[in-house]
Amino acid sequence: MPTAPEPPWRGRREETSRQPLTRYAIVEAALRVLDREGIGGLSMRKLAQELDVGAASLYWHVRDKEELLGLLLDRIVGEGSVPDPDPENWREQVKEMGRENRRLLQSHRDAAQISLGRIPIGPHSVPVLERNLALLRASGLPPRVIALAADMFALFVGGFAFEESMDSSEPADTDQLAEYFRSLPPEDFPTLHALADDLVAGDRDERFEFAIELLVRGLEAMADDD
């Protein structure tokens, strides 16, 4: 897979032979800290300790923690595997794109949280973006629809993966919630009462598959109307 140049706003300084650090080494070390301690434990000071260097030396390569998080997201998304587009099989390929992006955000601790509000742009993620867009383009949909669909998939998968990473929904909680819905007066809350069990049924995988099926069928309807 080809690499893309760094975006111009990252203000990278030229590295010289006198500098023992590289941006690559910093990002790899940051990924180790992230996996071990999460985003809350990732700081420039902790990263310097991981690399056994002074914190000030990091700023030659990385402006601040915000830029570091952007570099981490670029690195994580760059691990993605995207097939060549097949116009005859674009629907299943787009579904698999959603599954792969979910897997990527599950593969490193707090990766989903890092993805929120950030667009992965960098030498590792841009080739993945190109190939993901090519899968959507194989549908034959208009360019504007492709762009909006890509954004919608990213928003959905990122939000879904972030909710998964919180891991706050225990089985007992869903049982209690269903019991609460069933206890509501049916004359006042007929729909909640009727859907009490269905509202909490299904695991995360089932809900994820339903959502990407819904998104792809929407695109399919647009393709048929075009």
PLM features per residue range, with description:
Residues A25, A29, V33-E67, L71:
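Helix-turn-helix
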Residues M1-L21, P190-D198:
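N-terminal intrinsically disordered/low-complexity leader segments
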Residues D205-A223:
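C-terminal all-alpha effector/ligand-binding and dimerization domain
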Residues V82-S125, P143-I146, A150-F153:
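Hydrophobic alpha-helical connector segments
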Residues V128-M152, F156-F181, V200, L219-M222, ...:
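Hydrophobic alpha-helical bundle segments that form small-molecule/ligand-binding pockets
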Residues E179-A194:
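Short glycine/proline-rich, acidic loop/turn segments that cap or connect secondary-structure elements
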Residues L73, R102-R131, F162, M166, ...:
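Amphipathic alpha-helical segments used for helix-helix packing
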